[in-house]
Amino acid sequence: MPINLKKVASFGSACLLALCCLWNASMVVQAAPPTLPGYAHLLNHSDISSSQRGELLLGELQCVACHETDPASADRIWVRQAPDLSAIGSRVTPQFLTDYLKNPQAHVTGTLMPNIFHTSEKQARDGAVEYLTHFLTSLGGGLAAPKMGGSDAMVQKGDDLFHSIGCVACHGPQREDQEDSLYISLKHLASKTTVDALSDFLQNPSLSRPSGRMPHLRLDAKEARALSVFLLRDQLHNPQSLAADPGEEPGLGFAYYEIDGLNALPNFEDLTAHAEGSTDQITLNLPVSKRNNNYAIRYVGQLHAPTEGSYTFISISDDGSRIVIDGQVVVDNDGIHGRRARNGKINLSAGAHDFEVQFFNGGGGAELSVAWQPPGSSGRRGVPIPSDLLTTRTGKPMIPLGSAPFVSDPQKSRMGQRMFAAMSCVSCHPLDGLAPMRKAKRLNELDPDQNQGCLGDTIRRGLPHYDLADHQRADLKAALVAHAKTNPPLSPAETVQKTMAAFNCYACHQRDGLGGPSTALAEKYFQTTFEIDLGEEGKIPPRLDHAGAKFRPEALKSILTSDKLHVRHYMATRMPSFSPELADRFSQAIGAADDQPKFTEGPSFSEEMAAHGQRFVGVTGMACITCHRIAGQDALAIQGIDLSSVYDRVQPGWFRQFLLNPAAYNPETRMPQFWPDGKSPFPDILGGSPDQQVDSIWTYLSLKNSMPLPVGITPKGQ
């Protein structure tokens, strides 16, 4: 909405006067200090100065959003973007907003949001918060009534997912109480949002959290829904849900019938099912025992059409089948027959439609497949209906705790909008057309020892209260003192360290003795996706010591931004995706910090060298294929990293040094030392030179997926 800044300005003086009345002396709320896991890791390293830690806090707490700084300081202080509030009304309940604005620390343990009303009298505070709530809930069209439901089974799926793919690294285990400065609390979520909104957020976190501190885990719709149900599981027992309609669950319900003498689809309404259940897809492979003939199956639920238009549905079956949408028979493929395809068209509006598939088998072979052609698609065969578009209304309703009907008042919303600017909320949370009405002091003008400032013992009216711990205040003061003197550019090593702290890479990765999951967490929650004897290397994300020397720059960028070149297929913990800008900055910095150019030079290609390398990789050489897959073929014993991926990921110089002395680069590696004391077990090949022999392996690996298979590997299917 465009803002009349003149009116806002004229309103500003009166509003600020009112705010001064709000901010009179009162009791300071005692709560947990801001939780910054990356900062907590830095506290454990004696080589990191107080001012360096304070620089991180200045950015993460957004001090420079209000206190402008010079370009030199800006290079060292990276501002964490606050949540985007332009559509907050569509994802957060008004009741949570009200309680949170009154006292953020009391409702979200360790929140980075300061308490604006820490000196306000209750009546004045509540009035101001009411206006702000009406304004914020008007953004985004309001929170939609929850559609998705849950179940105990869905909670268990989400529980298993949360505690396996790496969520515990940042948020801690949710199966037991966990109050720790290394973990970001999630206890408030059940009163904050709905399964629908949280599911959308988990699939695209950067839309509302542009800072990237919550990364993209490449969750599909089913995974996001399961995680959301788990995180909001307290809503399943919400008394407000007792009278609510059932919620949506993924998949379709099915009913299985046994009927003798079938030669056509029966009237299902007159029958009692032999077994019932749910399925993610339309298939005959159901979790029930079926007999070979004279049975029928009915699949029922909702189909969510993504767009309005003409849809073609196709049924291929042996024997009969039928597709019914909104009570209308769209495809009739009934009767006794062999494999036969039938199709039909129907115009659908975007949204949910009653959906039913019927099938029977009278005898002989049995087959059923259902496909569709959405608007704009081509081809005659169609494609399977995406499973995330199929739901049933069988879930327990899930309603946010403490929620109630709410109607945004336009007049109160306008007052809240003006207050949002007057209180400088817009400094951290930019909104189109709004600007702060007053400017704070510049960063270099601040007095760190001001007792009534943000870092003082008695924070005066009008200033935000972060409830900082003593060591956090000390570090912030040290950073302010340092920045008043000199601001040298960040070194590559400092850039790497600051990135890993700000984005909490230390939760999973260790570098320079910092970070990595605790022993207790690693043993319990960092596992493999299948049984494989790789020890800690197979479970724990790799150390990042020497990572700049190891990776090709483009490979590292790809690892950080996409799911490409993620070669540890056996590791349950997922590598998140980050922004291209972050990936570019980090890959450049870590390359410079680890002297990347020194490792770029590799051997020239020759067929003779590749042939030697082929021998070394096979069972007549070093037998690398015992533990490594190669060109998509299984290894002989342990299904480790595929060697065909090495050339695209790794620098040749690092590869050479690693093979000659693996333990120097990873003390916990199971990679054997093939050239002990610089001596080769194959003295007759390439003059027994370890360097030459390693280079031959590199030359062979440069062929990637086109490499001829080494001795000991038989292609699949042969």
PLM features: what roles do these ranges have?
Residues 32-49, 73-141, 176-235, 407, ...:
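Extracytoplasmic electron-transfer domains, predominantly the class I c-type cytochrome c fold
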Residues 12-25:
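Bacterial N-terminal signal peptides
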Residues 65, 169, 427, 507, ...:
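Short, cysteine/histidine-rich loop/knuckle motifs that typically chelate Zn2+
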Residues 32-59, 138-163, 237-238, 244-245, ...:
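Electrostatic cytochrome c docking/interface patches
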Residues 1-8:
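N-terminal secretory signal peptides that target proteins for export/translocation
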Residues 35-38, 42, 227, 231-312, ...:
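Extracellular/secretory pathway-exposed regions associated with glycan biology
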Residues 62, 166, 223, 307-313, ...:
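Short tyrosine-centred short linear motifs in exposed loops/low-complexity segments
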